[in-house]
Amino acid sequence: MNSKIIEYLRKAGYNPYNDFYPIIETWLNLWKGKTDFHKYKVVYDDKTYEREMYSLGMPKRIAEDWASICWSEKDTIKTSPKNQKYLDNKLQEIKFNKQLVLAIEKSAYSGTCGAVLRVKNIKKFGDELVTDKFSKYDLILMKADQIIPLRVEHGKIIDCAFVSETRIQSKKVYYIEIHELVRRKAEDGEEYETYKIKNVYIDGEGKEVEKKGILKEYYTNSDIALFSILTPPIDNPYPEANGLGFSVYGNAIDQIYACDTAYHNFVMDYYLGGKKVFYNKKLTRRDDKGNIIYPDDVSKQQFQIVGDEMENVNADGLVHEYNPDLRIEDNKSGLQFFLDLLSFKCGLGTKYYQFDGSSGVVTATQYMGDRQDLTINAKKYRENVDEFVENICAGILLLGRLLFKENVNEKDKIEVINTDGFLVSEEDLKERYIEEIAQGLRSKTSYMVRFMGMTEEEAKQELARINEEDSLSSLGLTNEDEGN
């Protein structure tokens, strides 16, 4: 994190932490593919050359796989009937499914993803924000190195600053968007909580820069945040993290390097494993520049001078052929062992990345039924994803009510449903629905729509018939009695 940004926030009265960002930078560099670990030197012909190790690029693959595990386009978001159509339209407008997969990946590799809701092209008249036909929703995703928690309560980020680089008149500046929950007095004098959002631009020296057409400050008149935070379900061991999360491979860096070392060794065995032919010096000549010419040089294959004392080039000691052992099986088993360790340390189970000669990589779907450790960790991550999604949806509905004057309510229940049963089996989900119905937390209609393929109207009609039959049974009437 740029020290000038931290310095600006401290002068503004906040107390941001700065010690955790170097750790985040390590995770980001691994996700990009190469770090200083992958650099090495070789000495050849009395000269030193810098080289770069081959890498499997596993950190990015791990983050991508967690994103695929935790969300499917088949999954659905349900809310009250009056909210549903508006919410569906706005989620489609911001390409939510695509954005959410990227958000999960960002949270996996950097430890935290922040999603900030904005509305483009709005104007302020007095204390009122006004939209027009050009006003549109925007969802901005921030990785951990762009997020500065300002107030944290019980591990939850309440106040936060989001930082991004931009340009004003070709000069690089930093845009700081501050979300702060404050108390404000209503007209009747009663206090209420509301988020205050401030937009600030500073240059590389930490001085504020003016930008036209930007609202410097406004109140949302709601305690619902217009940002949402997603972290992996891992307790961060660093106290200086101040609410930020921990990368899924934050505790597996040694295993990442072990995989890359094994893979590099495997590749180098092939690179150096070509046939070697060693010649006695008697079989070589030098050109007029002093360069050595070998007998298998295509352009010099018949350089031997007539009358040379050496008559038998095939004599022992003159030519020696060497075919290095590629050690394929040893390399494969070693690489597989380190991949098993890596997947275990990243919460994916011991054999998530399993290669065999017939089927290639065993997919998560094939693997899920056999290994419960991945299922348990995935359910925990999915719970965090569900909360992340629900907060974004509540923010969309809030903006719809306040700015776009839509008849929606951000306080209505929002539910994220795992439609494809990837993390929760169909039978387990049925049992959960039945328990919630018995507890009065869910309607019978929702069960019939979800598991019996009915529309809501069909389910209501079927329940009416069931209730009617129950009433007749309680009166001691049957179909035969009705016929008489």
Question: Where do the model's predicted regions map?
Answer:
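Extended, regular secondary-structure scaffolds
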Residues: G114-F246
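Extended, charged amphipathic alpha-helical segments
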Residues: E210-G369, I417
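Surface-exposed loop-to-helix/strand elements on domain peripheries
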Residues: I77-K82, D287, E309-D428, L463-I466, ...
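Extended, helix-rich architectural segments
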Residues: M1-I158, R167
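Activation/maturation switch segments at domain boundaries
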Residues: R432-N484
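Residue-level preference for well-ordered alpha-helical positions
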Residues: L91, Y270, S343, L397, ...
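Generic structural marker for isolated residues within well-ordered, non-membrane alpha-helices
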Residues: L87, L339, C393, K444-T445
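Short coil/turn segments at secondary-structure boundaries
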Residues: L102-K106, L117-K120, Y270-Y279, Y352-S358, ...
